[in-house]
Amino acid sequence: MGTLACGKAIAAKRYSQNWNEWFWQSCLGKSKCSKGMPGEHFPLAAPRIGRVERPARAQREGSDAVATSYASIASKADLLAADAARDVALCGRSLHVDAQVRADLASAGVHEPTPTPYFVLEELLGKLGLTANDRLLDVGCGTGRVLAHAASQLPCRATGVELDARLANIASSWAASFPQLDAIAGSVLDISLAPYTCFYLFNPFDTAVLTRFLDKAEREAARPFTLVHMSDNGESFAYQGRPGWRLVRSGSIQMFQTASGRSIKFYEFPQHFSVWRYEGMQ
C-alpha cells in the first residue's frame, strides 16, 4: 500500500472510530462533546434525549456499519446508503417507501415522499438552539426521517403529521418506542397547532395551502415560534409582507462535504431555504 493510500486508510479508520463513539453517545444521551465530526454537518448540541436501549451487540454492529458507510462516502449514492443505514440504526427499521405506495401517491397528484438528508437537517434544525421546552412539528413527515433526527440530536419533543395514512403508520410504528416522539395521520390544517414552537416544512404543499397554514399558525401556535422552510423555491414570497414575521436566515444547499473534504453534488440545483420567526402583531 502506498504512503498516500495508507494515510487515507488510517484517516478513514480514525474517522470511523470517532464517528462510532459519537454516534451512539449522542443517541444514548451520553456525549459531552460539543464539536462536530470532521467534514460533516453533525455538531453535538447538548443535552440529548436518550433513546430506547437496544441490545449491546445490535448497537455495536449497527454503529460500526453506519460509521463505516459515512467514512467512505464518495458519491451521492453512498450518502443515500449511509443515511438509510442510519435510519435502521436509529429506528430499528428501514424508512424506505415501497414502489407501490410511491405509484399510488403519484397517481393521486401528491408530491413523492422525499426524506431530508441528515446533513441538511443538522444544518437547518441543529442551529436553532432548541431546548427541552420546545416542541417541533414536522409538516408532511412521511415515514419519519425528521423524527429520527430529533430523537438523537435535538433536546425537544417532536411530532410528525402526515396526510397519507400508510406513511404515517410507518412513522408511528417505530416512533412509539420513543416517549418524546409521536406521529399523526391527517392534515395539518385539521389539528391544533397550540403546543408547537417550531415547524419544519420540506415543500409539503402549494402556495394556496401554505397561506392557509400560515394563517392557522398565527392564530393557534405558541408565540414566538420558528418556522424552517426547506426548498421554498418560489414560495418564500408567501411570508413577505405578513405582519409579525421576521426573516432570521436564508440560503441554499446543494453540496455535501465528505470526511476528506471533497464536495459532492446532492441536489441537481441549489435548494433555497428560509428560517422565519413569528412574534405576533405589535
Task: Describe each region flagged by the PLM.
Residues 55, 60-131:
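S-adenosyl-L-methionine
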Residues 133-140:
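Conserved class I S-adenosyl-L-methionine
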Residues 144-148:
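Glycine-rich SAM-binding Motif I of class I
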Residues 157-162:
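Conserved SAM-binding motif I beta-strand of class I
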Residues 171-172:
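Conserved SAM-binding loop
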Residues 178-187:
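Conserved SAM-binding strand-loop segment of SAM-dependent methyltransferases
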Residues 197-209:
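A short SAM/SAH-binding and catalytic strip from SAM-dependent methyltransferases
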Residues 208-273:
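C-terminal substrate-binding/active-site "lid" region of AdoMet-derived donor-dependent transferases
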